Design a protein with these regions (language model features):
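Non-catalytic structural scaffold of enzyme domains
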Residues: 1-274
Length: 274
């Protein structure tokens, strides 16, 4: 296998906010030698209420910026972007771009036949998971619920708020009533709520976190392209946001185990701001 010089370049991971940290954690676990450029579009979250045209525009801007950072691969750590923009933007960039929908759908059909999907309003409306699941297994039944309050609650660090538990009960009730056996966490923010979801769901329901499966796919792609980093030395992770870097750092500390250094970036000028 030929290993290219670009193998030392970082992987780009992007989301609207801290949700993509669930993908970042999987990169650190499955690909510990890889450096990462993480971007959170916090100035424009939540994406779930945005129009498809807005989402596509944002993704183009982020990917152009990531090209300037010399990433060797981009992972859309955002189901809304994956559902609405992936197929459109792929043709315009000369680097592999991976999304969450297909890996998540394929994992779900391997777990059960009555599959629930919780996601943002935009992802649910796109029906991307319904199509991907039914293409993978025409016998599967899919039940979707949009959960618009989850992302703002997580970004506000209100996971342990009693209100969040009540909201989760309300969202999951129809899925429990139809007897799902599998639940796809169709937004990268939602694994942060796994503890709460487990309280509400029957014990036999399997949770599917697409983050682990998209990183598995990324690992296979890097192998095929000879771009996997086998470099000795410590891999780095650099954090960038479009909004308030201090706020992102404080919220993300819960999952990173430390306070990250976060820089603010202007997507329009591709220049770092102080």
């Amino acid at each position: 296998m030929v290993v290219h010089q670009e193998a030392r370049f970082p992987i780009g991971v992007f989301d609207s906010g801290v949700g993509g940290l669930t993908v970042l954690q999987e990169v650190h676990r499955q690909l510990p030698n890889e450096s990462v450029v993480y971007f959170g579009d916090t100035a424009r979250l939540p994406y779930g209420k945005r129009s498809p045209a807005e989402i596509i525009e944002y993704v183009y801007e982020i990917l152009h910026w990531m090209q300037s950072e010399r990433v060797k691969m981009a992972i859309m750590a955002c189901n809304t972007s994956s559902a609405l923009a992936l197929d459109i933007v792929r043709k315009d960039f000369d680097l592999p771009i991976l999304g969450l929908i297909l890996p998540g759908a394929r994992a779900a059909v391997g777990k059960g036949k009555r599959i629930g999907v919780i996601a943002t309003t935009a992802t649910v409306r796109s029906e991307a998971y319904v199509r991907a699941i039914c293409e993978s297994d025409p016998q599967a039944q899919v039940f979707q619920v949009d959960c618009p309050e989850f992302v703002p609650l997580i970004e506000s660090d209100r996971i342990n708020d009693p209100y969040t538990l009540q909201v989760a009960r309300d969202y999951l009730r129809p899925l429990v009533e139809v007897g799902i056996d599998t639940l796809v966490l169709g937004c990268t923010h939602y694994p942060h709520l796994s503890g709460i979801l487990r309280i509400i769901l029957p014990g036999h329901v399997t949770l599917v976190n697409p983050a682990s499966y998209v990183v598995k796919a990324a690992s296979q792609e890097l192998d095929l392209m000879g771009l996997k980093c086998s470099c000795s030395g410590k891999a780095s992770t650099n954090f960038f946001v479009s909004g308030d870097p201090d706020r992102f750092a404080q919220v993300s500390r819960r999952w990173l185990g430390k306070l990250p250094v976060v820089q603010k970036v202007s997507l329009s000028s591709l220049e770092l701001l102080s």
